[in-house]
A protein has these predicted regions:
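Pepsin/retropepsin-fold aspartyl endopeptidases
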Residues: 1-130
Length: 130
């Protein structure tokens, strides 16, 4: 699948006057979205906890995780999503968790985000209870 970017506004959920806009790489292989820590700190987003992650090259890394408001321009919607405080030179990545929160998938032919229907539960959720 070809790589592409989407414009995203990141906003401090506790102070909506503090935000920035950036082009993010859409990365379905990344569980979480990544933003360079100085950008998140610059708008006052605070870490909530630490997460151990496996990076694309196989290394393990401990990173801070917080929450921010994400507005994906082409969707015109705003939702709270988890975000990893990346290194200063980190790429801006829009990960699978954010994509699922917004109810979208990637259309590789058009390099656009497309709406999907959410699945609630599975086999056990569909069984009658006696």
């Amino acid at each position: 699948m070809g790589m592409f970017k989407v414009a995203v506004e990141i906003t401090n959920p506790n102070d909506r006057a503090r935000s920035f806009r950036e082009d993010f790489w859409v990365d379905t292989g990344a569980l979480y979205s990544f933003v360079p820590a100085p950008r998140l700190e610059g708008i006052g987003v605070e870490p909530l906890r630490s997460r151990e992650l496996i990076l694309a090259d196989g290394r393990r890394d401990q990173r801070l995780l917080g929450e921010a408001l994400f507005t994906i321009d082409e969707l015109g919607e705003t939702l709270t999503c988890p975000v990893i405080f990346g290194p200063s030179d980190s790429l801006y990545l829009l990960g699978a968790t954010a994509l699922e929160n917004f109810g979208v998938d990637v259309d590789p032919a058009t390099k656009k985000l497309k709406p999907i229907l959410g699945v609630i539960g599975g086999f056990l959720a569909s069984r009658e209870q006696f």
